[in-house]
């Protein structure tokens, strides 16, 4: 995203300091991309003083991306301020994206017509099988895969667990897991932005 010249801001439900998941600081998650962030004082400073969701103006962003991790299941699922922001961003033709469990923050989002944003959309994210393999199925608050299907989403469940993949459809981009955040999700978001720019240039409405 930086290479394409996109500016990035980081917000959080309550604002302020955002702690990092200790497990994510270890192998295999501590890859070169993660190290570059941890070694950058400028980037780490973004996590120390984040604005709260309620202060974000949806009209000033071309895309919003929800970070993953199991904490998203607790922090995002029933956050009405986040859901209102996502709906506003999506309905004005901007991109909504997620990585891993970040898609839990999208599942309960309703659009102005009362429908669920994910209804009829292709999406992906951690499966229930993967939660069982990770021995956390008894610790998480719900089955996100099942909830996605209940909301009418066309959920993609890969045969091989933990593979890196992404799905993009009509302004919604979802990455299967945190390993999908780099080239896959970021590239898909850029492609969606290019597609929307092309439609706007032709005078067409985004789908």
Predicted features by range, described:
Residues 2-92, 96, 104-207:
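Extended, subdomain-level signal for the structured scaffold at the beginning of enzyme domains
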Residues 100:
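Aromatic-residue-lined binding/catalytic grooves and analogous aromatic/hydrophobic interfacial grooves
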């Amino acid at each position: 995203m930086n290479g394409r010249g996109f500016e990035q801001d980081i917000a959080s439900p309550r604002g302020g300091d955002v702690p990092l998941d200790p497990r994510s600081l270890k192998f295999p998650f501590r890859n070169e991309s993660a190290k570059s962030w941890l070694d950058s004082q400028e980037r780490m400073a973004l996590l120390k003083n984040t604005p709260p969701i309620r202060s974000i103006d949806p009209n000033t962003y071309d895309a919003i991306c929800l970070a993953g991790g199991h904490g998203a299941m607790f922090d995002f699922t029933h956050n009405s301020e986040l859901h209102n922001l996502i709906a506003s961003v999506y309905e004005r033709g901007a991109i909504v994206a997620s990585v891993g469990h970040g898609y839990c923050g999208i599942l309960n989002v309703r659009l102005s017509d009362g429908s669920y944003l994910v209804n009829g959309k292709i999406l992906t994210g951690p499966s229930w099988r993967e939660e069982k393999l990770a021995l956390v199925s008894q610790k998480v608050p719900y089955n996100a895969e099942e909830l996605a299907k209940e909301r009418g989403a066309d959920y993609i469940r890969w045969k091989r667990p933990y593979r890196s993949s992404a799905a993009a459809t009509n302004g919604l981009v979802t990455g299967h897991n945190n390993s999908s955040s780099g080239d896959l999700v970021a590239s898909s978001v850029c492609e969606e932005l290019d597609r929307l720019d092309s439609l706007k240039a032709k005078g067409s409405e985004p789908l």
